[in-house]
Amino acid sequence: MRGPLYQPLGLDLDDGVIRRRRLSAATIGFACAATTIIAGSTAIALFGQPQPRMVDRFDVAASSEPPPTVVAASPAPVVREQLPVVISGSDTAPPPRGGVGFRVEDPQSLRQNPSTAHMPDDALIEDSAYGPLPARAPDGRRPYDVYAGAWSGKPGTRIAIVVGGLGISQTGTMNAIGSLPPGVTFGFSPSGNSLDRWMQEARRSGHELVLQVPMEPVGYPQVDPGEDTLTVGDAAAGDLSALHASLATITNYVGIMNYMGGRFVAEPAAMEPLIAELGRRGLMFFDDASSLRSVAADTAQLQSVPAAVSDLSIDRSQDPADIRSQLDTLERIARAEGTAIGVASAFDVSVATIAKWIGEARGRGIEIVPLSALANDPERR
């Protein structure tokens, strides 16, 4: 018999030990299989059914590299449509490229940007045989809104001062534009010289403009306001050619005011077609109050046209002390009523006195505002 060295390993164990070892091995194998199944089920539940992959069967046998690590793919980024870009009324920059822009309007957002205030808005111009006439834009904007001067919009004591006669004297016009602050409104004469040049200078300086239209006075034609005078008879007959001739001499104004016209503004038959034409074109009417019988304000109210009336004339006298006294009276009216409107001419003494007084009045809390800021505008309500 061969010795123990030549016996197969494990054959010297009794049956009980062999059975226990077989049982233990079977148990371990079963446990491993169960663990594998559970782990696989869990992986499938978490990551989904793995997709079959075609491989070369010889590569599997030949490759000794460990299997690659499976990394969950990052989710694709969500592509959203670009949101609209909100532009405030004071913004002038265009929306970002590719964005959708819309404007959130505020009460002053229709006003021209100061950098382009000297340029007429093509949408507000009607071509005619007389030249460019002011007109409402197709979107409803009015010259009255677009060419309006800027002011703070805050409540307080406010005064509007209209200085007329610009364009007649070149030196006087240059002096007025250079001396008076932006809040002052300028009245241009249609019979003036270099009107487009002075209009641009005034608008660049921040001034609001009105056009002084010659209208029939008492005593006409012996008392003659000048070329293209709008008469009562013509207006009542529906002939507004003289008005159109004046309107075409300049652009970028918010409305018109009467030059003389004591008889005209007192005649409803003449004022009604005039005010209707202004309303159609989106302009205001300013009454200088030279006639106590004027029906301008009432007619404008009935036709929903912006209008304003002067409270007093500042410079009937060319004495600086008298001008100063009138300005002080204007301030008292404004403090009692909240607002006041004064009218003057572009004489050198008037301009110098008004400019000095405005500087002092601002120190007392008075705001000098454009004429349109104090006009009654039924359409805006």
Predicted regions and their residues:
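His/Asp/Glu-enriched short active-site or ligand-binding loop at hydrolase and phosphoryl-transfer sites
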Residues: 277-323, 370-375
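Hydrophobic membrane-insertion alpha-helices, especially the h-region
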Residues: 29-43
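Active-site beta->alpha N-cap acidic-glycine motif
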Residues: 139-223
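C-terminal domain-boundary segment and adjacent tail
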Residues: 278-292, 346-381
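Alpha-helical scaffold elements lining the catalytic groove of polysaccharide deacetylases
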Residues: 224-248, 265-270, 298-306, 310-335
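N-terminal, positively charged topogenic segments adjacent to a membrane insertion site
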Residues: 1-25
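Juxtamembrane proline-rich low-complexity "stalk" or linker regions positioned immediately after a signal peptide
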Residues: 45-133
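Hydrophobic faces of well-ordered beta-strands that scaffold small-molecule active sites
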Residues: 159-163, 184-188, 209-213, 256-258, ...
